From Swiss-Prot:
A UniProt-annotated Pfam family: Motile_Sperm
Membrane topology: Single-pass type IV membrane protein
InterPro entries the UniProt entry points to: Ig-like_fold, MSP_dom, PapD-like_sf, VAP
Protein name in the entry: Vesicle-associated membrane protein-associated protein B
Superkingdom of origin: Eukaryota
Subunit text: Homodimer, and heterodimer with VAPA. Interacts with VAMP1 and VAMP2. Interacts (via MSP domain) with ZFYVE27. Interacts with RMDN3. Interacts with KIF5A in a ZFYVE27-dependent manner. Interacts (via MSP domain) with STARD3 (via phospho-FFAT motif). Interacts with STARD3NL (via FFAT motif). Interacts with CERT1. Interacts with PLEKHA3 and SACM1L to form a ternary complex. Interacts with VPS13A (via FFAT motif).
Provenance organism: Rattus norvegicus
Post-translational modification Phosphoserine, affected residues: 146, 159, 206
Length: 243
């Protein structure tokens, strides 16, 4: 005996598409329409009942009316290489006069009175998921380009500025050399003068004479040491510029 053709209209007719990401519940709608002049009972079945929640999953559609069924896919780890084998079936039949006990209605239904339509599930990722990859490429390209252009932009700044700095440092170095030489000569003269004064003013074995002489020597030594340190720093700067 030939199977009765489905009287309900389905939108979509063949596929239920679920668009990710699938880290949360994804819902798609199935619209059932009843173009006939009789009420129609329906129920929705799936090959993977643990993966989906269907509301409403059964009921009665009045003549000329339609109904939206929400199919909710539960979160899962999506693998793009794995094809979905999940399927749905919409089963229907013309409603009997008494529909108060739908469970009994379906149990008592004859196979030749049942109509069904099958839909397969399709998982899709949104196009936006590919955009971060393009953004990363755009970030990498300008960075590498700037690195290659940087040495070209830096070339005009090197020679004139370095020559002027070297001249200034060399002049300062010569001035410091003269200052060091002058302080050495001054230190030598002061030592001689202090020695003569100390011998005239105090006995040679006096502690005061030795203290006065050592104090002046320490002052000159400190100034001389400071100049030597400064001279060393200038030398280091010249060495770096030369490199």
């Amino acid at each position: 005996m030939a199977k009765v053709e489905q009287v309900l209209s389905l939108e979509p007719q063949h596929e239920l598409k679920f668009r990710g990401p699938f880290t949360d519940v994804v819902t798609t709608n199935l619209k059932l329409g009843n173009p006939t002049d009789r009420n129609v009972c329906f129920k929705v079945k799936t090959t993977a009942p643990r993966r989906y929640c269907v509301r409403p999953n059964s009921g009665v559609i009045d003549a000329g009316a339609s109904l939206n069924v929400s199919v909710m896919l539960q979160p899962f780890d999506y693998d793009p290489n794995e094809k979905s084998k999940h399927k749905f079936m919409v089963q229907s039949m013309f409603a009997p006069p008494d529909t108060s006990d739908m469970e009994a209605v379906w149990k008592e239904a004859k196979p030749e009175d049942l109509m069904d339509s099958k839909l397969r599930c399709v998982f899709e990722l949104p196009a936006e998921n590919a955009k971060p990859h393009d953004v990363e490429i755009n970030k990498i390209m300008p960075t590498s380009a700037s690195k290659t252009e940087a040495p070209v932009a830096a070339k005009p700044l090197t020679s004139p500025l370095d020559d002027a700095e070297v001249k200034k440092v060399m002049e300062e170095c010569r001035r410091l050399q003269g200052e060091v030489q002058r302080l050495r000569e001054e230190s030598r003269q002061l030592k001689e003068e202090d020695g003569l004064r100390a011998r005239k003013a105090l006995p040679s074995n006096s502690p005061m004479a030795a203290l006065a002489a050592s104090g002046k020597e320490e002052g000159l030594s400190a100034r001389l040491l400071a100049l030597v340190v400064l001279f060393f720093i200038v030398g280091v700067i010249i060495g770096k510029i030369a490199l």
